[in-house]
């Protein structure tokens, strides 16, 4: 309850100070607070003032005086000179002041000038004899002639960084430093007050002794009466008698007043100001409180009424010099320096305060009088600089040392009012105008601080630290003061700015005073610190415009910006107080920090992260820090989190800056850690926490200055910080959770405001300005922005708009290019990864660093610099890496050491600095290498210190050992000084180092260990709890010490030490002004969220699961909602998926019994997110819709529906629990299993889950109308989704619908909620454009495909019916030509028909089509195609009813009624034909097939009517037909599909009648309409339709398409024969169109002929003959050439070359006729004939001899085939045995038994296959060659052919025949070859080609004789060949033996007959020429048997011989 009392006291105190302030400023708060003080003085003194009348008159006079008697704002030259005398007066005053204030003052400080305003100068209390908090720092500066000396007495001038000195030691050092500065006579900022530094003579003034401030009569009289009454009262006081000087001065003044008689006309018109002042000053110097009070009261009123001339100069007190203003030093006497009356009055009034012993009434009058001197409306007030500061000091001292709480309050209020008035005097507009003019001179002005730092950095860095910050501030003051020229025009604005600076500096110095560890809150030091901190807070808060303006400068040579001038002091304030354990101090310091963050972060861009990361975050994580500190800091963090611009700019300027800490990331991680803390809390504790949420955490109300009087403060610093009634961690957890949500809310706010920005004009200008222009115009631009904002906003709360203005007003703002920052962040992250690699394995990191550009190369210098300059490296890893012994690492180590500068350092300091950069390894060799290089570097930079480097090396090593020995806890016996001396004997080149030197080293190491400060700091932070535990023991049970506080104080010092190092590094390399990036782009939010979203997710998830209260869970849900919104907006898919997944988990829909209200709220949030962010959810829609499905299930269950009938989709996704549970249960139903087997954990879990029920309360929530409406809106508002989003939505919805169906696949009433919604969504989105519907239906179509083919018919019928309804709606929408949306949405019907074998489904779809056609036929466009494609599938059905319905629908409905509709659609006609084609090919229903063919035939007529011109058609009909044909190629698009339908039926239909009718219909159509076809179309018909009919023949020698010989026989007897004949007939009919494709026809016939099947071959031969003979008269030369080529090809293909190729000896073919024989042999002389005859006789004898041996040989072309029982004449398959026949013998009719007789048992299958293939090939080719010979014979027997064939082609044919004859003759003559073929088992018997030889010879001779007879011109060429062949044949015949070669003789006899008949028909001449040779042979023929035919031929020949020769004889 003490905390609550504290709050009440604080509120009461606030009220008191408020009332006091109100009283003090009741007339005019900003101008006349002295009236209020005057009334307070009356009450305090208890006296009746006698000046009531003059006081009232003075009030009137004051008003008039303000308007009429105000002096000019600018000082006259005389006034400026008048101010030069006050320095010496101040010095004199100080001496008196020292005597009067405290007789026992400590003289160590010399003079009170050396003390600061801060109370800590006297906090040791009066018993020590020190000054009682006289705020003298600033006033004594002026008193010593320096106006504004450097006052920071809290800086530590020592160079030591240990920070171990006590507060008193620091004060003594600071005071000594200030004393030295003042004795040195530094100019400080005296020039800014126009007070000369060393002037000893006051300049002459134009004022006279007797001239005073003139006024009207009434004012003058009132003033005289006031003064006279006061002086008379004083004179009557008994105490005045003790001071003769005062008494005399009063008497002189009264005497002077007596000269003016109010009753006479001698009315005064002026008051002698000096005379009056001297009297009152003398009165104030008395020791009488009453006299002082009266004098001070009079002075207060005089200055309040401005009755005295403040510009007059007066002598110091007790001076004997004249006050004549015109006196000069001509008489040789130097007068003492003079002061202005205002300055002298302030000195006099201030001297009246004597510390704690001062009378209360005097204290009050002092405050009143000082406020009267300072607070005035006139902006030209002369109270500036030192006087102002002295007045402030005095009032401050009254507040601190007064024993009267009321006086303390009044002093505090007055002080606040005075300071506020100082800042109110700064004219921002004037500053702006002056700044604009200055900017034209030099736009690159920098502050003196920056210039000084830059100049110092050029030589040796002067780092900013906490311990030497005071000294740095003093140095800066000197630098700024030195820039002030002696003669510069000081304006009132300059004075106002300088006063503001001085006041701020004074307050900062007071704040910086350290406090003792144990202090009373009512002590002077604490109250002083609190007041100064609150004043600084008020200054910044109430006058933030002054700090924001970069156009307010301190006057000087280099005009320093105001914010830069106070920067170091503000740093000092924060760094000295940020870690204070006192709650009020900590709070106000943190509030100041917040002001910097909220308003000045652009100016303190480098300081803010230092304080946050080095002080506040470490403190907040200390276990010893107070709960108030943690909670209050977290509350400030929450403010940051609530400010979008601050967050974004933190990220840009810190997290994306490689040289800055990741402030944003650190903050979020800190909040996440707190949010993840597991805290158990009772309901009672929670209620306590809820109660205090609305209460303020702060000790004081910061909206106004708190009353800090001693009576209003408690003595204990912990009052008000009572023990919390709830866990601290819980409070932190809840606030951190709020912070996380606030961050998200701010990011979302920034993103959406930026998406629709009302961008500030200045922002646009700024972002559009180039870099150079931005630098030039930065000052003026930022000032204009600030001015415009300030005029429109009176308050400066951190609103969004104000924040933007403030950020823009920074000096160094640059454009925030999102890409630039993204790259910076990526590079920073990459560097962090490289550092992590280095800390783990240093050597692996170097190549990575080079690759990523962090190192330019692997040179030692580059690596060494990187190791020194990079933060975050593990010092141990650096030491190990540098200490490696290989050459590369040693070189890097040397380069590393060479980077250090040890110049001027002692060896210990150098070693200490050196060892701060790495941890020294433990190995001696590594240490040795380090020390060797260190010694070399040290000696090089410090020559003369040691004689050689060895000395430094040994000494360094010795110091390392000493440091380890003295400070290691493991070493008990420490090294003594003597041992250390002995260790270092003779190391300096054989000599000892000086003993004093070594002793100093020893002592320094002993007192200050060399250690890594960073590791020490971290160890201290992590071990703060251990400090408390170490200090506690059993013996201090009764100890009253606060060990936790002591531990915290110890750690806080370490924090300060670390912060000092950070500031040191912060300013080390500063080369110019910092660039601050103001946020303006929405893309920054994306980068931030991508970086931090995992932390957000981690922070929001556990609290929701851990707590059930609405507030906490709603916060988590809000955070998730915003996160999803951000992730969706910026397409951060991983984040969006994760957050949606978390929200889905929060719904907890899988566990019915565990659903709570928070889960229902999660459902609501999820639905709201879906509605608001639907356009960006993409893949997350599925999770959401799955939840919707589960919610609908819960709603059904809540209504009483059995849960088993509504399966859970989510459970079915993993496994069907119900099925698995029931199956497991059913599997264990045996009798013994009931008791013998226990359920497994899985089964128990399934049973428990199955038995869950929904609570009534949750059922009510689940079924609420709000939830139902939200669920419905998900679908009804889908029409508002974008085109891409609706596709994502439908994808998800279809996926969920499929899962629903799968989960209830076997149910009688399957779950189809999502399926129904999918249909509904289609209706809702029916108005979408086709562009959006196309991808939409692509998804839905696939879903319907799956659903409509489901095994559950209920699902299928629902899907089909839904499709039907949707299709009816879609068909109502007009579809333009060229679009195919109807095709798309009707496609699922086709898929369903194709993949569903259910008859009912197919019938239902056919009925749907019928419905479409009957009702929407006119609207159907592209939809015809899927309808007809579907009907094609139904046409293939094996169910007659399906095929029948298809046939009726197509024939009766479509073709009859809607043929033209179909015909007009692209591709639809071909699909219509395809339906008929499929029906014709359906082998089960011949009748339907024939009906379909009939329909096709009729449709052919319809198509012909449409396509071809008919003279009987009207013009309208022609136009109608043209419209139908528009866009169509009548041949390609119309006729070809029709003809192809017939063709396909011909090729594939199984029914013979169908095939035959199709063939007839096709050729009928071709014959009927072929005349309309063009040549190109005919070519296509032939190649695509006609020739493919015979495609089975494309491979020569085999027909393997048919499964059986019966199939082949049927095909041959029907289709092939009929088709070939029709084809030839068609060719003949349309010869003109088809003749150019003769090659194709001939090639087709060649394929027919070259088949093993004898039937096919003979059909082909017959058709070829028919083709040639029917068109013989139409062929041209080209055609005959093609025919010749065909015969060439046929003879070549049918030549059995295998007979020679497979000779085992490979001897090849041997010619049986000598090649030397020429055509002229027959015409040679008889000698040659006789020689030839002899040769022939010998050949004949050989032939006869061989013939006897081969009589039993087998004729391949005749006998072999004939042995097959006439198979070649049948149409029943292969004519020769196959491999299969050989391996698996069949009946004799299908195989050759002789083959297997000679087969070897060990012959492999491969050999058998090869042998049979060879034999088959030989037989087939020989047979076919005989057919070709026969064909030629028949052709030449035709007179037309013989007449039409060109001679060239006829000769070509004779060559073929001659070649065949010679081939067979050569083979027959090579008896050895034939024998070898038998031995090689190529054939079974010795083969011969007798039939081929005789047939070829016969046909050849016949053709040649015809040619001879028909062509007289060519006889000469022909006769020679003819005679040669005839002679050869006859000679061969004659040589045959009648007894042994009867078969050969019989074979050749017909040839001999033909030869003789031919000879008979020779011309007489030719007969005469060639008959002699033949005559001899004929005579030999008679030796043989001569049958009748031969006898008749011989008779004719001999008769012709007789006629020729006998007649001549």
Curated annotation (Swiss-Prot):
- Low complexity: compositionally biased ranges: 134-143, 155-165, 210-220, 771-788
Sequence positions bearing Phosphoserine: 212, 215, 447, 452, 455, 807, 1226, 1741, 1752
Q: What segments bear the compositional bias annotation Polar residues? A: 17-33, 194-209, 1708-1723, 1764-1777
Annotated Basic and acidic residues bias? 37-53, 1724-1751
- Cross-link Glycyl lysine isopeptide (Lys-Gly) (interchain with G-Cter in ubiquitin) placement: 797
- Recite the other comments: Present with 3670 molecules/cell in log phase SD medium.
Question: Per its UniProt record, what PANTHER family does this chain match?
Answer: GUANYL-NUCLEOTIDE EXCHANGE FACTOR, LD29171P
What's this protein's name? ADP-ribosylation factor guanine nucleotide-exchange factor SEC7
């Amino acid at each position: 309850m003490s905390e609550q009392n504290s709050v009440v006291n604080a509120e009461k105190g606030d009220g008191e100070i408020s009332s006091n302030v109100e009283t003090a400023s009741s007339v005019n708060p900003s101008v006349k607070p002295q009236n209020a003080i005057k009334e307070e003085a009356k009450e305090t003194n208890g006296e009746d003032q006698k000046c009531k009348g003059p006081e009232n008159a003075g009030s009137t006079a004051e008003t008039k005086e303000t308007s009429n008697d105000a002096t000019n704002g600018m000082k006259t030259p005389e006034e400026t000179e008048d101010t030069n005398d006050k320095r010496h007066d101040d010095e004199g005053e100080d001496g008196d002041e020292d005597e009067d204030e405290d007789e026992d003052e400590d003289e160590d400080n010399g003079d009170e000038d050396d003390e600061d305003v801060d109370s800590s100068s006297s906090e040791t209390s009066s018993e020590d004899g020190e000054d009682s908090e006289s705020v003298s720092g600033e006033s004594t500066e002026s008193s010593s002639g320096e106006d504004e000396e450097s006052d920071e007495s809290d800086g530590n001038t020592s160079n030591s960084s240990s920070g171990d000195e006590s507060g008193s030691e620091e004060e003594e050092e600071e005071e000594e430093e200030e004393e030295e500065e003042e004795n040195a006579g530094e100019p400080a900022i005296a020039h800014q007050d126009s007070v000369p530094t060393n002037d000893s003579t006051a300049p002459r003034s134009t004022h006279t002794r007797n001239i005073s401030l003139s006024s009207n009569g009434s004012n003058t009289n009132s003033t005289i009466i006031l003064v006279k009454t006061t002086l008379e009262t004083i004179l009557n006081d008994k105490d005045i008698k003790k001071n003769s000087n005062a008494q005399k001065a009063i008497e002189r003044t009264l005497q002077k007043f007596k000269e003016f008689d109010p009753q006479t006309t001698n009315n005064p018109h002026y008051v002698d100001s000096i005379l009056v002042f001297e009297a009152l000053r003398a009165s104030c110097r008395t020791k009488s409180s009453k006299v002082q009070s009266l004098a001070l009261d009079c002075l207060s009123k005089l200055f309040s009424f401005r009755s005295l001339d403040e510009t007059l100069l007066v002598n110091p007190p007790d001076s004997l010099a004249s006050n004549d203003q015109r006196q000069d030093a001509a008489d040789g006497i130097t007068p003492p320096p003079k002061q202005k009356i205002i300055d002298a009055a302030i000195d006099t009034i201030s001297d009246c305060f004597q510390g704690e012993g001062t009378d209360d009434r005097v204290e009050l009058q002092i405050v009143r009088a000082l406020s009267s001197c300072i607070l005035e409306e006139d902006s030209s007030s002369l109270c500036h600089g030192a006087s102002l500061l002295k007045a402030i000091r005095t009032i401050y001292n009254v507040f601190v040392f007064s024993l009267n709480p009321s006086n303390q309050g009044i002093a505090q209020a007055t002080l606040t009012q005075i300071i506020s008035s100082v800042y109110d005097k700064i004219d921002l507009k004037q500053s702006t105008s002056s700044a604009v003019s200055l900017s034209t001179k030099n736009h690159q002005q920098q502050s003196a601080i920056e210039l000084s730092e830059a100049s110092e950095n050029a030589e040796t860095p002067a780092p900013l630290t906490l311990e030497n910050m005071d000294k740095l501030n003093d140095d800066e003051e000197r630098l700024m003061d030195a820039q002030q020229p002696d003669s510069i025009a000081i304006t009132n604005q300059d004075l106002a700015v300088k006063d503001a600076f001085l006041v701020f500096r004074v307050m900062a110095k007071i704040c910086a005073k350290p406090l003792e560890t144990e202090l009373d809150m009512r002590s002077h030091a604490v109250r002083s610190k609190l007041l100064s901190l609150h004043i600084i807070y008020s200054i910044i808060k109430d006058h933030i415009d002054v700090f924001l303006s970069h156009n307010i400068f301190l006057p000087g040579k280099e005009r320093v910006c105001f914010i830069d001038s106070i920067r170091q002091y503000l740093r000092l304030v924060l760094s000295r107080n940020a870690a204070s354990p006192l709650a009020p101090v900590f709070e106000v310091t943190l509030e100041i920090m917040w002001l910097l963050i909220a308003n000045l972060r652009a100016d303190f861009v480098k300081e803010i992260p230092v304080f946050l990361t080095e002080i506040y975050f470490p403190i907040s994580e200390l276990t010893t820090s107070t709960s108030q500190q943690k909670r209050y800091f977290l509350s400030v963090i929450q403010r940051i989190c609530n400010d979008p611009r601050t967050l974004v700019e933190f990220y840009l300027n810190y997290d994306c800056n490689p040289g800055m800490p990741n402030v944003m990331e650190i903050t979020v991680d800190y909040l996440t850690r707190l949010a993840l803390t597991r805290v158990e809390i009772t309901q009672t504790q929670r209620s306590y926490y809820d109660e205090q949420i609305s209460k303020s955490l702060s000790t004081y109300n910061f909206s106004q200055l708190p009353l800090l009087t001693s009576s209003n403060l408690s003595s204990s610093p912990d009052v008000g910080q009572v023990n919390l009634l709830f866990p601290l961690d819980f409070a932190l957890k809840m606030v951190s959770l709020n912070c996380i949500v606030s961050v998200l809310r701010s990011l979302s706010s920034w993103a959406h405001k930026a998406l629709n920005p009302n961008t500030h004009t200045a922002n646009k200008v700024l972002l559009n300005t180039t870099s150079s222009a931005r630098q030039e115009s930065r000052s003026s631009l930022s000032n204009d922005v600030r001015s415009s904002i300030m005029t429109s906003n009176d308050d400066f709360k951190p609103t969004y708009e104000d924040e933007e203005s403030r950020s823009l007003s920074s000096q160094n703002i640059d454009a925030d290019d999102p890409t630039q920052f993204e790259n910076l962040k990526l590079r920073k992250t990459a560097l962090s990864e490289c550092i992590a690699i280095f800390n783990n394995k240093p050597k692996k990191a170097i190549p990575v660093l080079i690759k990523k550009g962090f190192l330019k190369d692997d040179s030692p210098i580059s690596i060494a610099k990187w190791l020194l300059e990079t933060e975050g490296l593990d010092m141990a890893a650096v030491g190990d890496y540098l200490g490696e012994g290989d050459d590369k690492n040693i070189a890097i180590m040397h380069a590393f050491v060479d980077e250090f500068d040890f110049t001027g350092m002692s060896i210990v300091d150098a070693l200490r600095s050196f060892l701060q950069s790495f941890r020294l390894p433990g190995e001696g060799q590594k240490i040795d290498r380090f020390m060797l290089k260190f010694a070399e570097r040290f000696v090089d930079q410090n020559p003369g210190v040691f004689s050689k480097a060895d000395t430094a090396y040994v000494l360094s090593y010795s110091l390392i050992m000493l440091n380890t020995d003295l400070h290691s806890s493991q070493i008990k016996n420490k090294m003594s000084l003597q041992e250390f001396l002995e260790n270092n004997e003779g190391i300096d080149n054989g000599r000892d180092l000086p003993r004093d030197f070594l002793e100093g080293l020893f002592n320094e190491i002993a007192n200050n260990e060399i250690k890594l400060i960073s590791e020490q700091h971290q160890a201290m932070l992590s071990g703060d709890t251990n400090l408390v535990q170490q200090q506690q023991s059993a013996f201090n049970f009764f100890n009253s010490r606060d060990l936790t506080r002591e531990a915290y104080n110890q750690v806080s010092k370490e924090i300060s030490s670390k912060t000092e190092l950070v500031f040191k590094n912060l300013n080390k390399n500063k080369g110019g002004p910092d660039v601050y990036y103001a946020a303006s782009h929405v893309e920054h939010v994306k980068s931030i969220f991508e970086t931090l979203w995992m932390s957000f997710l981690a922070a929001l998830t556990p609290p929701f699961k851990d707590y059930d209260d609405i507030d906490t869970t709603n916060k988590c849900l809000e955070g998730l909602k915003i996160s999803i919104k951000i992730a969706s907006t910026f397409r951060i898919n991983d984040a969006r998926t994760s957050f949606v997944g978390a929200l889905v988990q929060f719904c907890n829909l899988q566990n019915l019994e565990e659903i709570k209200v928070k889960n229902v709220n999660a459902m609501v949030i999820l639905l709201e997110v879906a509605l608001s962010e639907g356009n960006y959810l993409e893949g997350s829609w599925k999770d959401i819709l799955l939840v919707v499905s589960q919610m609908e299930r819960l709603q059904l269950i809540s209504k009483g529906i059995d849960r088993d009938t509504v399966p859970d989709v989510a459970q079915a996704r993993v496994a069907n629990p119900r099925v698995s549970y029931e199956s497991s249960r059913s599997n264990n139903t045996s009798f013994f299993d009931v008791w013998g087997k226990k359920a497994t954990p899985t089964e128990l879990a399934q049973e428990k889950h199955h038995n869950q029920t929904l609570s009534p309360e949750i059922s009510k929530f689940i079924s609420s109308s709000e939830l139902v409406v939200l669920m419905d809106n998900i679908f009804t508002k889908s029409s508002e989704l974008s085109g891409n989003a609706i596709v994502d939505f439908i994808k998800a919805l279809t996926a969920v619908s499929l899962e629903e169906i799968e989960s209830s696949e076997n149910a009688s009433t399957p779950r189809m909620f999502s399926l129904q919604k999918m249909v509904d969504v289609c209706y809702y989105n029916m108005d979408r454009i086709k562009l959006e519907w196309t991808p939409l239906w692509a998804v839905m179509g696939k879903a319907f495909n799956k659903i409509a083919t489901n095994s559950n018919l209920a699902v299928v019928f629902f899907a089909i019916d839904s499709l039907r309804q949707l299709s009816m709606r879609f068909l109502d929408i007009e579809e333009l030509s060229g679009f195919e949306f109807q095709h798309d949405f009707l496609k699922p019907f086709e898929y369903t028909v194709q993949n569903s074998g259910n008859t009912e489904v197919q019938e239902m779809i056919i009925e749907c089509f019928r419905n479409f056609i009957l009702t929407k036929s006119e609207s159907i466009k592209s939809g015809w195609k899927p309808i007809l494609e579907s009907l094609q599938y139904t046409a293939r059905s094996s169910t007659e009813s399906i095929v029948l319905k298809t046939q009726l629908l197509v024939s009766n409905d479509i073709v009859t009624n809607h043929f033209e509709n179909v015909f007009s659609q692209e591709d639809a006609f071909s699909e219509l034909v395809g339906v008929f084609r499929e029906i014709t090919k359906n082998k089960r229903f011949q009748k339907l097939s024939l009906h379909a063919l009939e329909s096709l035939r009729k449709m052919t007529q319809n198509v012909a009517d449409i396509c071809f011109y008919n003279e009987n058609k009207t013009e309208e009909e022609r136009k109608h037909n043209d419209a139908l044909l528009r866009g169509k190629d009548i041949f390609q698009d119309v006729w070809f599909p029709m003809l192809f339908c017939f063709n396909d039926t011909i090729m594939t239909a199984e029914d013979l009648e169908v095939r035959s009718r199709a063939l007839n219909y096709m050729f009928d159509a071709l014959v009927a309409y072929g005349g309309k076809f063009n040549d190109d179309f005919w070519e296509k018909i032939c190649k695509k339709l006609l020739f493919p009919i015979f495609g089975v023949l494309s491979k020569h020698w085999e027909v393997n398409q048919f499964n059986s010989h019966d199939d082949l026989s049927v095909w041959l007897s029907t289709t092939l024969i009929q088709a070939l004949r029709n084809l030839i007939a068609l060719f003949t009919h349309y010869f003109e169109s088809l003749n150019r494709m003769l090659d194709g026809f001939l090639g087709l016939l060649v394929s027919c002929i070259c088949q093993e099947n004898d039937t096919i071959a003979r059909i082909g031969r017959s058709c070829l003959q028919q083709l040639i003979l029917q068109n013989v008269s139409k062929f041209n030369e080209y055609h005959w050439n093609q025919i010749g080529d065909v015969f060439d090809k046929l003879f070549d293909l049918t030549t059995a070359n295998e007979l020679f190729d497979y000779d085992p000896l490979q001897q090849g073919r041997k010619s049986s006729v000598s090649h030397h024989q020429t055509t002229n042999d027959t015409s040679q002389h008889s000698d040659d004939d006789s020689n030839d005859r002899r040769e022939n006789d010998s050949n004949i004898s050989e032939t006869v001899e061989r013939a006897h041996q081969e009589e039993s040989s087998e004729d391949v072309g005749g006998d072999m085939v004939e042995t097959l029982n006439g198979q070649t004449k049948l149409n029943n398959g292969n004519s020769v045995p196959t491999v299969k026949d050989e391996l698996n013998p069949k009946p004799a009719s299908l195989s050759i038994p002789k083959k297997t007789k000679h087969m070897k048992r060990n012959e492999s299958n491969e050999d058998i296959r090869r042998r049979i293939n060879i034999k088959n090939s030989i037989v087939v080719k020989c047979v076919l060659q005989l057919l070709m010979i026969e064909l030629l014979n028949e052709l030449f027997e035709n007179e037309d052919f013989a007449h039409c064939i060109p001679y060239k082609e006829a000769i070509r044919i004779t060559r073929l025949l001659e070649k065949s004859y010679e081939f067979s003759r050569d083979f027959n003559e090579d008896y050895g070859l034939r024998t070898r073929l038998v031995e090689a088992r190529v054939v079974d018997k010795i083969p011969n080609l007798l039939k081929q030889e005789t047939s070829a010879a016969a046909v050849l001779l016949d053709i040649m004789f015809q040619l001879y007879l028909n062509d007289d011109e060519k006889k000469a060429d022909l006769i020679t060949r003819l005679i040669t062949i005839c002679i050869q044949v006859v000679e061969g015949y004659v040589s045959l033996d009648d007894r042994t070669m009867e078969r050969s003789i019989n074979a050749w006899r017909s040839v001999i007959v033909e030869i003789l008949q031919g000879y008979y028909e020779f011309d007489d001449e030719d007969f005469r020429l060639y008959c002699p040779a033949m005559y001899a042979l004929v005579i030999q023929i008679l030796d043989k048997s001569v049958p009748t035919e031969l006898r008749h031929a011989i008779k004719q020949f001999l008769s012709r011989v007789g006629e020729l020769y006998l007649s001549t004889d």
